């Protein structure tokens, strides 16, 4: 089961989140049938949103959009504070690797664009923020957003490793944040440790990558685990929701679906579930609008 572990240095100077998001990203790949680069780009976006959602309280919903002028198109993710996330990538078929090593490439092909976040607190006044893509690798772009928009200097690492068949092998990441009151000495010590950390891909390849991440972040520094919470890919689409969307269409449009297509098929962008509405269903909607 996927999870996020929240922890804090005993000194109170820093906190860290570490995530195992393997099942989340594997299910996203399965639902969208993504190729290698698209899988990694979508997976990193989902993990970033899982981190962002874990930072919120109440029943907030968080939307993350990675919008670039690239082969990937837009990447959209929506998460809640209960550990659920969903998402999709416009172009599922991007498959770009280094010839020599087989490394999956994302950043060099993301192009120019923006990292957009929308936090809906349920009050009718969502908070939106837009920051430019810095590298297109998504992790660095997320860290830049946290520093610029939330004024919280953060170290971010997130990645998706694929097997020889380009299926998700492991996915996860971490966030480390300085807390108010940290001394210059403590900040310098943690900056040095983060600079010396192995690459996120190396840590994820460890047998128990969650413990490996915590060990790399804290070293010999004493820390406390605050909580361990489940994570999952979960879409909240339903037939009723799409039926309500059809009800917003003019009668003439519904009648055209009956006359021309003998019904309608609606596919959820976030999970690929197909909903069929036959002629009788559409006629009932027309009658309900009368």
Swiss-Prot record:
Superkingdom classification of source: Bacteria
Transmembrane segments: none
Subcellular localization(s) per the UniProt record: Cytoplasm
Protein name stated in the entry: 33 kDa chaperonin
InterPro entries for this protein: Heat_shock_Hsp33, Heat_shock_Hsp33_C, Heat_shock_Hsp33_N
Principal location listed in the UniProt entry: cytoplasm
Post-translational changes noted in the entry: Under oxidizing conditions two disulfide bonds are formed involving the reactive cysteines. Under reducing conditions zinc is bound to the reactive cysteines and the protein is inactive.
CDD domains: Hsp33
Organism: Streptococcus pyogenes serotype M4 (strain MGAS10750)
Gene Ontology cellular-component annotations: cytoplasm
């Amino acid at each position: 089961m996927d999870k996020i572990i929240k922890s804090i240095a005993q000194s109170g100077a820093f906190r860290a989140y570490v995530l195992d998001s393997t099942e989340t990203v594997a299910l996203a790949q399965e639902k969208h049938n993504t190729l290698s680069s698209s899988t990694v780009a979508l997976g990193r976006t989902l993990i970033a949103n899982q981190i962002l959602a874990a930072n919120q309280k109440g029943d907030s919903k968080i939307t993350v959009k990675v919008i670039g002028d690239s082969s990937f198109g837009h990447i959209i993710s929506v998460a809640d504070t209960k550990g659920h996330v969903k998402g999709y990538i416009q172009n599922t078929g991007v498959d770009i690797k280094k010839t020599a090593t087989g490394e999956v490439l994302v950043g060099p092909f993301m192009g120019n664009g923006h990292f957009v976040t929308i936090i809906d607190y349920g009050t009718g006044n969502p908070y939106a923020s837009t920051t430019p893509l810095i590298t297109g690798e998504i992790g660095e772009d997320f860290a830049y957003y946290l520093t610029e928009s939330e004024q919280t200097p953060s170290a971010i690492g997130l990645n998706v490793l694929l097997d020889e068949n380009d299926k998700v092998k492991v996915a996860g990441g971490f966030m480390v944040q300085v807390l108010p009151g940290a001394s210059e000495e403590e900040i310098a010590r943690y900056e040095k440790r983060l600079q010396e950390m192995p690459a996120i891909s190396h840590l994820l390849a460890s047998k128990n990558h969650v413990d490996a991440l915590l060990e790399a972040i804290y070293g010999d520094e004493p820390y406390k685990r605050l909580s361990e919470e489940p994570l999952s890919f979960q879409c909240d689409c339903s037939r009723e929701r799409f039926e309500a969307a059809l009800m917003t269409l003019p009668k003439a449009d519904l009648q055209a679906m009956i006359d021309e297509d003998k019904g309608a098929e609606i596919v959820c962008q976030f999970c690929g579930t197909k909903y069929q509405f036959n002629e009788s269903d559409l006629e009932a909607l027309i009658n309900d609008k009368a």
